[in-house]
């Protein structure tokens, strides 16, 4: 069977299994302790000002009985939080899916002990599923909790997608594993964000550089922010200095990957001197360069592997080779470039193959090639470029409208190149 050949990478039995009894017991004991100690306290603050307590969240999740071999965690923050907890409590793998995406059915059954499934493009540019055990999830959550002192930072504001690894680990998983309350900001724009934050004396705010730029240039007040974190794409020195000069706010740069969780962060209280500075390794994370200069990460939060590994990849058994070329500078990491095919648009990783296929279907044009190019807006990171086997004169507004009819707004090319 082709699926068996692809999945032999894991070295596990190829049949559906629930989360391991040991992992399930570990999570269950942690969660029961949180409910016993903080049952009447708020676990989730909703956009309308109401709050759901830990005891109420526990009851709602236990009432959700998974009907199949997985739980699909999709929707807004309250839905994701309930569904995650329901799957974890019942020992059923939870698959994270963004609101505007369809579920990718894994190409093979999840390996033994799988508790969480992410579907992501990542640096490779290929959308795949990634599998994680309870222990691997907890390792990433606890590593950030300790290094960033999240237990003493107040409420975590979920203004970015909780279906993404960064938003997931910094907010709702902190709630489920460490009892840190989450505040739901229904939209990442200035007014909804301020409405969400204003009820709390102290909050920590994760965001991507494009959002931080929007917040800093808008009317957002940051008086109650105890910690500002940026990830997803490089944080420029200009944006970091704007935050300090305009608001006295230090934005800490965090680096990681969905496959292995957080790797390093800028722990300094002042501005960096080099925009490539990715900070120091987080405790328990080891890193080195391979012969191609790519960063190889070894830690307890590295996942089990992909559903469809590509030739030459190394992912699993505690080790992950990234698509990023990194230069060590003493105890700090310095970003050089990404050598993967993935396109990074404002912190969102996109697949060139997926975009090209949608344009082919919509335009009925076979010759479509998609790649990323550096954007003039550094916070955007990259722009999408479409190269078409079509005379340039025929790439008019009507053609673009038709060609983009199947694309999400963030997948639309900014540059179109045809034949002379």
What are these regions (language model features)?
Residues 299, 318, 323-417:
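AMP-binding/adenylate-forming catalytic core of the ANL superfamily
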Residues 20-33, 37-67, 102, 108, ...:
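Conserved AMP-binding/adenylate-forming core of the ANL superfamily
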Residues 280-281, 288-319, 338, 350:
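Conserved ATP/PPi-binding loop(s) of AMP-dependent carboxylate-activating enzymes
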Residues 23, 27, 65-100, 159-161, ...:
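Conserved AMP-binding/adenylate-forming
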Residues 204-206, 216-273, 286-288:
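Gly/Ser/Thr-rich phosphate-binding loop
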Residues 141-155, 163-204:
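Conserved AMP-binding/adenylation subdomain of ANL enzymes
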Residues 75-76, 92-105, 180-200, 209-210, ...:
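ATP-dependent adenylate-forming carboxylate-activation enzymes
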Residues 115-142:
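Conserved AMP-binding A3 loop
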């Amino acid at each position: 069977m082709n699926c068996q050949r692809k999945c032999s990478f894991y070295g596990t039995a190829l049949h559906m299994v629930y989360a391991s009894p040991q992992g399930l017991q570990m999570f269950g004991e942690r969660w029961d302790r949180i409910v016993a100690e903080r049952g009447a306290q708020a676990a989730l603050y909703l956009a309308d000002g109401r709050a759901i307590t830990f005891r109420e969240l526990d009851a709602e999740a236990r009432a959700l009985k998974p009907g199949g071999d997985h739980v699909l965690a999709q929707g807004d923050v309250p839905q994701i939080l309930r569904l995650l907890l329901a799957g974890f409590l019942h020992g059923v793998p939870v698959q994270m899916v963004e609101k505007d995406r369809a579920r990718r059915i894994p190409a093979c059954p999840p390996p033994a002990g799988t508790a969480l499934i992410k579907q992501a493009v990542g640096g490779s540019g290929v959308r795949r599923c990634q599998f994680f055990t309870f222990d691997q999830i907890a390792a990433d959550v606890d590593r950030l909790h300790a290094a960033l002192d999240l237990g003493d930072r107040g409420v975590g504001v979920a203004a970015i997608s909780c279906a993404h690894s960064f938003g997931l680990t910094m907010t709702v998983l902190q709630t489920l594993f460490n009892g840190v309350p989450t505040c739901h900001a229904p939209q990442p724009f200035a007014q909804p964000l301020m409405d969400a934050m204003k009820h709390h004396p102290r909050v920590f705010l994760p965001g991507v550089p494009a959002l931080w730029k929007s917040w800093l240039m808008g009317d957002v007040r940051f008086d109650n922010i105890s910690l500002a974190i940026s990830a997803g794409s490089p944080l420029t020195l200009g944006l970091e200095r704007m935050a300090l000069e305009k608001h006295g706010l230090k934005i800490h740069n965090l680096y990681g990957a969905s496959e292995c969780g957080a790797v390093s962060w800028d722990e300094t209280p002042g501005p960096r001197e080099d925009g490539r500075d990715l900070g120091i390794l987080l405790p328990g994370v080891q890193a080195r360069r391979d012969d191609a200069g790519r960063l190889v990460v070894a830690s307890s939060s590295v996942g089990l592997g992909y559903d469809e590994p590509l030739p030459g990849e190394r992912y699993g058994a505690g080790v992950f080779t990234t698509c990023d070329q990194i230069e060590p500078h003493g105890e700090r990491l310095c970003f050089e470039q990404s050598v993967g095919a993935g396109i990074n648009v404002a912190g969102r990783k996109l697949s060139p193959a997926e975009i090209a296929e949608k344009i082919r279907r919509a335009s009925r044009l076979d010759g479509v090639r998609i790649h990323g190019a550096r954007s003039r807006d550094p916070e955007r990171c990259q722009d999408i470029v479409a190269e078409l086997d079509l005379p340039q004169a025929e790439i008019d507004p009507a053609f673009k409208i038709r060609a983009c009819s199947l694309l999400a707004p963030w997948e639309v090319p900014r540059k179109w190149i045809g034949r002379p």
